[in-house]
Amino acid sequence: MPTSPSREVAVDATKVELVSKPLLASAALNKFSGYHFNPSSSGVDSNLLILLHGLGDNDSGFFNLGQNLQKTLPQTAILTLQAPLKVPFLEGDHWMWYPAFDQFAELLTKPNPTVTVASVVALLDHLVGKCGWSAGSIHIFGFGQGATLALEVLISWSKSHSQPLGSIVSIHGSFISHPTISSSSTPVLHIYRSAREIPLDSTRWSSHRKSTSALTLHRLRGNEEDESMLKGSEWDSVMSFWSKFFRNRIKWELEGKVVPIG
C-alpha cells in the first residue's frame, strides 16, 4: 500500500534554536576573575560545556583541556571560568571558588560557597535567557573544589528552576550543604578513587542520592587520598557518560524544518 509523501513544515522562526550562540557580555561574567569561551569548531553550537578548575589552579589549563575535548565532542562550545578569590599565603595565579582557609592557613571545616554558587546560577540564567542556550544543553565538569561547586550549583538551580541541566560531572567533589529538596533529574556522574567499591546505598552517597534521581558512580582504583586529575583511559567513563546526553543536530534541524511522521 503506497504511502503519501511527507510534507516539510516550517518551524516558527522565533522558536527555532540558534545555530551559533555567541557569549554575550554580562555583569554575571564579571563575578569571576577570568573566563575563556570557544565556540564549536563546526560552527554549530548544540552543547555548552562549562569547566570548573580545582583549588589553587586557574582556568588556562582547563581551557586547553576543553579545546582538546572539542575534537571529540560533537557541536560543543566550551566556557572555562576562573575562580573569583585569590588563595591566601600563595604568590602567583592561584584561585579558589570560595574561602577554604582560616587565618592560620588551615582548611576550613565548614566552608561557605553561597556567594559563588549564586554567581554561577546568575551566569546560567544569562546563558539561557540571553545567549540562546536551553538549560538541558548546558553541561558542567568540575574537578576538586570546582566539582564541589558544581554539585552545590545543582542544588541551588533545582530549587529555583524546573528545567534540569544537561549533566554534571564531578571529579572528587563533595557536598557542603545537605539537599532536602526532591531530587533533580539532571544526570550526575561522580568519580572517586578508592581501593574498594563503595555501594550506591552507602551513607557516603546520601547527599548525592538526594541531589539527583539520575546518579552514576564510577570508581577509579587507588587511594582515597589521591585526588589527582583523570589520566588516559580514566576518561573513558566520562566520554561514555557524555555520549548519552550531548546532541548532534542534523541538517533539517539546522534549517528550521521538521518532517512529520505519518
From Swiss-Prot:
SUPFAM superfamilies: alpha/beta-Hydrolases. Keywords: Hydrolase. This is Uncharacterized hydrolase UM10204. It is an enzyme of class 3 (hydrolase). The keyword Hydrolase applies. The lineage of its organism: Eukaryota, Fungi, Dikarya, Basidiomycota, Ustilaginomycotina. GO terms for cellular component: cytoplasm. InterPro entries: AB_hydrolase_fold, LYPA1-2/EST-like, PLipase/COase/thioEstase. It holds the Pfam family Abhydrolase_2. Belongs to the AB hydrolase superfamily. AB hydrolase 2 family. GO terms for molecular function: carboxylic ester hydrolase activity; palmitoyl-(protein) hydrolase activity. It comes from Mycosarcoma maydis. Its EC number is 3.1.-.-. The keyword DNA-binding does not apply. It comes from the Eukaryota.
